[in-house]
Amino acid sequence: GQLALKQQTVNRLLNKIYSPISDAYSELKQL
């Protein structure tokens, strides 16, 4: 259970970091 919780936290962190990046990336590709 502890490992799964840790994985969720890591995933959420990665999401927070990568979401703006991928958003900006898709905007760039539309230019």
From Swiss-Prot:
It is found in: Secreted, Extracellular space. Its main location: secreted. Hemolymph. Keywords: Copper, Oxygen transport, Secreted, Transport. Signal peptide: none annotated. One of its GO terms (cellular component) is extracellular region. One of its GO terms (molecular function) is oxygen carrier activity. The keyword Ion transport does not apply. Hemocyanins are copper-containing oxygen carriers occurring freely dissolved in the hemolymph of many mollusks and arthropods. Belongs to the tyrosinase family. Hemocyanin subfamily. This is Hemocyanin subunit 2. It comes from Maja squinado (Mediterranean spider crab).
